[in-house]
Swiss-Prot record:
The keyword Metal-binding applies. A divalent metal cation binds at residues 146, 148, 177. Belongs to the FAH family. This is Uncharacterized protein SAR0930. It comes from the Bacteria. One of its GO terms (molecular function) is metal ion binding. PANTHER family: ACYLPYRUVASE (PTHR11820), ACYLPYRUVASE FAHD1, MITOCHONDRIAL (PTHR11820:SF7). It comes from Staphylococcus aureus (strain MRSA252).
């Protein structure tokens, strides 16, 4: 399944994309009319949090089938053209990110490949698909992109052994880890350079892990104004998904809705000769196999 959060008519909701339809099933409305018992999560995060007691996907499937059988299916669907995409997990939880997890990317920035380089991104930096974000020219002329696979955590745990780590994964999404390279080079910590307003575009969907059975063998392609900048594969990750979860959970308790950004392949603007940073009016597209394309616009 592909889940998303969105705004429609000034109301925040969440839903599911079914098959090849260019519309979202509004699960807030579907559950209001067709939920089994008291299962009626008001947000996608609430659905993930209740997944340990009731199979969230199965409850969604049953409710959508009931809506289809009602003869009023169209009343519960909204065209993608009419919605504003929000970060898939809304309200947002923790975003924990790994840097230098692709050797070629570390090399292009002249960084040593370290065993563990972790930072967080502020919740206020999150935005959804098709968002227009500030160009931040008032503070930097080195705005950069990083296309990444995001892991969506599905259940709580800490000190999770590698052998069990994938049991804690609910699904995957796309992240563009927008970075102020100027601040990154001047500061000892990464939080500020990674937490600009609009600096964490995410989405458009969460794809459940059953629909992405080989997440460590998917292509990541980033285009700026239709020019391919990054063309990598998650198979190039230094720490694999189970290792990332094991490492983080040694120190941080993970909870449903937490997002782990797994690092970016080579091809960022700062690594080019000469560097090619994002400019006002640019369009950035990050595509990952079987998830979709995350589009971001830099304001003029």
């Amino acid at each position: 399944m592909k889940f998303l959060s969105f705004k429609y008519n000034d109301k925040t909701s969440y839903g599911v994309k079914v098959k090849r339809e260019d519309a979202v099933w509004d699960l807030t409305q579907v559950f209001a009319d067709f939920a089994e018992g008291d299962f009626h999560p008001k947000t996608l995060l609430a659905g993930l949090q209740q997944n340990h007691t009731l199979d969230f996907q199965e409850q969604v499937r049953k409710a959508v089938v009931a809506a289809e059988d009602s003869g009023k299916a169209e009343d519960y669907k909204i065209s993608f053209n009419d919605i504003e995409f929000l970060p898939p997990v809304t309200p947002p939880n923790n975003v924990i990110a790994f840097g230098r997890n692709y050797k070629d990317h570390a090399n292009e920035l002249n960084h040593e490949v370290e065993r563990l380089y972790v930072f967080t991104k502020a919740a206020s930096s999150l935005t959804g698909d098709n968002a227009k974000i500030p160009n931040h020219k008032d503070i930097t002329d080195q705005l950069d992109y990083e296309g990444e696979l995001g892991i969506v955590i599905g259940k709580s745990g800490e000190k999770i052994p590698k052998a069990l780590a994938l049991d804690y994964v609910y699904g995957y999404t796309i992240i563009n880890d927008i970075t102020d390279r100027k601040a990154q080079s001047e500061q000892d910590q990464a939080f500020l350079s990674k937490s600009l307003t609009g600096g964490c575009p995410m989405g458009p969907y969460i794809v459940t892990k059953d629909e992405l059975p080989l997440p460590e063998n998917v292509n990541i392609v980033t285009k700026v104004n239709n020019e391919i900048r990054q063309d990598g594969n998650t198979g190039e990750m230094i720490l694999k998904i189970d290792e990332l979860i094991e490492e983080i959970s040694k120190y941080v308790a993970l909870h449903p809705g937490d997002i782990i950004a797994t690092g970016t392949p080579a091809g960022v603007g700062a690594g080019m000769q000469p560097p090619k940073f994002l400019q006002p009016g640019d369009e950035v597209k990050v595509t990952i196999d079987n998830i979709g394309t995350l589009t971001t616009y830099i304001a003029k």
